[in-house]
Amino acid sequence: MKHLAALIAGLLLTAGCGPKAITVGSRPFPAARPVFSDASGKALEALPAADGTIRLVFLEFPWCPACADVWRAVGISAKPFPQGTVRVYRVLFDRETVLTPDGRKEVPPLRPAPLPEGDGPEDPLALKVTTLTALPVEFREEFRVSQGPVVLLLDAEGTVERRWIGFSAGMSRELSSEIMKRARVLSPRPPGT
């Protein structure tokens, strides 16, 4: 009995160790250490400022067949709202796991990630997209993400309010509904901005 109690105590002490799951109600960013890099290569532990917009975090993985569908759903859901209502943090992973005769290996993506649709300067309804790259070792040691793609809806303080894993046919409708709820709370922008 004494050994069982010691085992349970040991398991409870180590239960908080290791990568955390990004769950609804958690506040993953800022992380304890840098887990992203921006376009300039600067390491970041937090998402860049979002100027009061509705924030979505899109964890996009290499060889992700559903990622194009998720991008389409995000674009469709944000289209009815004024430009700048939604900011998407696109987090790319620059490593993928491949199976080789020697076992599993982490390698750079075998093909580059395509740019999301509707992210061009010529598109007047373009989403505000900030692209970041996950630092492979640091992100994996800080967070546990077992499958993707993942879309997180954050509140103003950075707490995860909703999480979607994978793609579903009703995703754009769900996202649009969540944006609508939050867009009512946002103060109207002054004319001409």
Predicted region positions:
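N-terminal "domain-start" segment that seeds a small globular fold
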Residues: 17-47
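Short loop/turn microsegments at loop-to-beta-strand junctions
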Residues: 32, 54-55, 148-150
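Short active-site neighborhood of thiol/selenol oxidoreductases, capturing the structured segment around
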Residues: 48-68
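Structural microenvironment flanking redox-active thiols in thiol-disulfide oxidoreductases
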Residues: 68-123, 136-140
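Bacterial N-terminal signal peptides
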Residues: 5-15
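Short, solvent-exposed mixed-charge patches
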Residues: 190-193
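Positively charged n-region of N-terminal signal peptides that target proteins for export
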Residues: 1-3
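Thiol/disulfide oxidoreductase modules built on the thioredoxin-like
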Residues: 125, 135-176
